[in-house]
Curated annotation (Swiss-Prot):
Similarity-based family: Belongs to the UPF0225 family.
HAMAP family registered for this protein in UniProt: UPF0225
Record-linked NCBIfam families: PRK00183.1 (NF001213), PRK01752.1 (NF002486)
Protein name according to UniProt: UPF0225 protein CGSHiGG_04185
Coiled coil: none
One Pfam assignment: SEC-C
Length: 160
């Protein structure tokens, strides 16, 4: 958390042109919750920059949180230098599902590299969560990860 406290007066790493305290900092300190999927995406990127792995875990859809490996996430964060974030596109898929396409620039072993992804976010009880496609997902006939009660194939599975 020391990196968070030192960053409060600095520009936010998510490149929103706001100070961290007025942007992602309030989400990291749980003073507020992201109101949009894009805000959650930006706050998760910033959490990686600041190595705030607990925030990464709690902003992943609850049914997937126990499947994450915080130690591996921490190792990855410790060995990655993030250089920038560009939001390419945001889409509202349904009232409770959105997609954010982004490009994150980071320093690789020999040169700068880019990670581009289209991430899916779901809103559960008025809070946005990231659906992690890298952990085990339900089969198409099982209940959806978002807790909607629908089968996965008729809900979030259609977007992943």
């Amino acid at each position: 958390m020391s990196e968070i406290s030192t960053a409060l007066s600095e520009d936010c790493p998510c490149q929103s042109s706001h100070h961290y305290a007025d942007c992602c900092g309030k989400f990291h300190l749980r003073q507020a919750f992201p109101e949009t999927a894009e805000q959650l995406m930006r706050s998760r990127y910033t959490a990686y920059v600041l190595k705030n792995i607990p925030y990464i875990v709690v902003t992943t859809v609850p049914s997937q949180q126990t499947l994450l490996k915080p130690r591996l996430l921490q190792e990855w964060a410790d060995n990655t230098t993030w250089l920038g974030l560009e939001i390419l596109k945001t889409e509202s898929l349904t009232k409770t599902q959105s997609a954010v396409e982004f490009k994150a620039i980071f320093q690789g072993e020999e040169c700068e590299q880019a990670h581009q992804e289209r991430s899916i976010f779901v809103k559960i009880e008025d809070r946005w969560y990231f659906v992690d496609p890298t952990v085990s997902l339900p089969t198409m006939k099982q209940p959806c990860v978002c807790g909607s009660g629908k089968k996965f194939k008729h809900c979030c599975g259609g977007f992943l």
